[in-house]
Amino acid sequence: MGCPCELRIYAGQKHQAQLAAKACMDEATRFEQKYSRYLDSSAATEINRSAGIKPVEIDAETYAILKYAGVCYEQSNGLFDISSGVLRHVWHAQRSDLPSEDEILRHLNLVGWEKIELSDQNIFLPISGMELDFGGIVKEYAADAIAALARTMSIRHGLVNLGGDISIIGPQVNNRPWPIGIVHPTIADTAISVIHLANGALATSGGYERYVEIAGKRYSHLINPQTGWPVESLLS
């Protein structure tokens, strides 16, 4: 998934823990193979490759993820938009100068969840060059799915951490909640806060590890889909 992943599980027997761990890791691999934009065979690549050409048939799982992406888009007033991944072509690590407003505008014309044609059978990106980036939503979905899978295998204590997207399987063995540290965005090896969770989930992101540096200034990988510029007011 292009990020460190962690699985912590506790079981009464070693064999039970090994079986559950393998099942959980296999499920994580399945999600990556299905939704990674870096794999030619993935559903995400097929959707993007067909932009402006034809609708792509989708299964129930993909439809559920896309419907949830739509909910996030509405609840965030358009700030969470999985069609904004195309802006990574503007803000990439090889840049040595700031992009022009024309370059940003050309890419912004390819952004917009409201442009997408979606049904429970297929999806169509109507403009050639449009792209969906599932990375901002699939990790959360996958973490919840993996935690649920572990519980079906009688795992009652543990957590799933997919690059900062955390889903709790159950509390620690002593029934205490898990302490989840929120990394300080500017001070190395420091937590800005600690949240204790015995159930539920938590998703975090920040620009302290993934960023573009231009003329000595760091620009976050978190990009405002309405302006085309990296966010500055929210570091973590």
Model feature map: region roles:
Residues M1-S236:
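Mature catalytic core of soluble alpha/beta enzymes
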